[in-house]
Amino acid sequence: MKEIRQFTSESVSEGHPDKVADQISDVILDAILAQDRRARVACETLVKTGMVLVAGEITTQAHIDYEQIIRETITEIGYNHSEIGFDGATCAVVNAIGKQSSDIAQGVDRELEEDQGAGDQGMMFGYASDETDVLMPAPITYAHRLVQRQAEIRRNGELPWLRPDAKSQVTLLYEDDVPVAIDAIVLSTQHSPEISQATLREAVIETIIKPVLPADWFAHCRSENIHVNPTGNFIIGGPMGDCGLTGRKIIVDTYGGMARHGGGAFSGKDPSKVDRSAAYAGRYVAKNLVAAGLAERCEVQISYAIGVAEPTSVSVNTFGTGRIAESRLVELIQAHFDLRPVGLLQMLDLIRPIYRKTAAYGHFGREEPEFTWEQTDKAEALRDAAGLGPATAEIINVRSERH
């Protein structure tokens, strides 16, 4: 008898107040890294009606016009008029940025680059699953694609009443851990006052939802389980509706709850912070193990001590789907991936201004050039080292059928 279960993940758009904050923090990081590769950045942002506050610790030789960068980012997101409730041209900008503590710096900055220590203690998780073509869990993948589609339709003017703030949620049905159908959808989008709820619902379903979701999965979803703006009007949104903070959407940023999370946020942190770089490396490791056919699902945990270069632990969980022992997978990881802080930077080419794009629609499952941690360039070597030989036609065919 098949085991049936549900799993739900959510995402939010670039205009959600927490994501506005994340993008501002990462735009500042990018601007600094473009001038100073050795900068240390920990930038936090708060947005609320009529104001932006940036704070944190930044040590750099770069010369940055913080106010201009912040205003441009808000305007690009779509908050460009007081009628929307937030305007990048007129909001107040408060700067409370200081410098990195010398106590932290002495553990991170070393004479020899290879001795660079971790910027903090902590544990980070990476995850991959063969249930989608990007080796990500299906619920978060389609939750992201819904709000990405909302932004695309808003920007191209196809539905001119759309506004920047939006949220999505997708519930999938699984049979024996394989996704087979969509059971429920929530899509809430900010809108201008003149649109009726009936018109909005029909347009959102036809223009945003149906083009994104697999038709065979969507066919199983009952109409009463498609929730479009279920509370009615969503006119007041963005920072006017809610206070936004950097780092408050860490599950949206990662695996939608399908994998564990070490607790550290990403945005606004330069890659010397293992909260960010080791989480990216964890995804890189897990994705390559799954791409190599060594497991169908894989979760990798890496941990560090502040000021220490080598990880304090590396562990793997394949949830019973591994082709070889998990202890052997750990050996392969240690042989094929340099998980020291300097190794993370070099392996994934992280000291670049690439982070604005990561700050909305997820840090993983994005196969664009900036997302080096999504490459599967080590899969063949891992498979050979495991003694499994080249990928079979059977494996290739199964993967080609993923949604």
Curated annotation (Swiss-Prot):
Disulphide linkage map: none
Annotated L-methionine binding sites: 57, 100, 242, 273
PROSITE patterns recorded: ADOMET_SYNTHASE_1 (PS00376), ADOMET_SYNTHASE_2 (PS00377)
Pfam families assigned: S-AdoMet_synt_C (PF02773), S-AdoMet_synt_M (PF02772), S-AdoMet_synt_N (PF00438)
A GO term, aspect molecular function: ATP binding
The protein's enzyme class: transferase
GO CC entries: cytoplasm
Name under which the protein is recorded: S-adenosylmethionine synthase
UniProt similarity note: Belongs to the AdoMet synthase family.
Cofactor note: Binds 2 divalent ions per subunit. Binds 1 potassium ion per subunit.
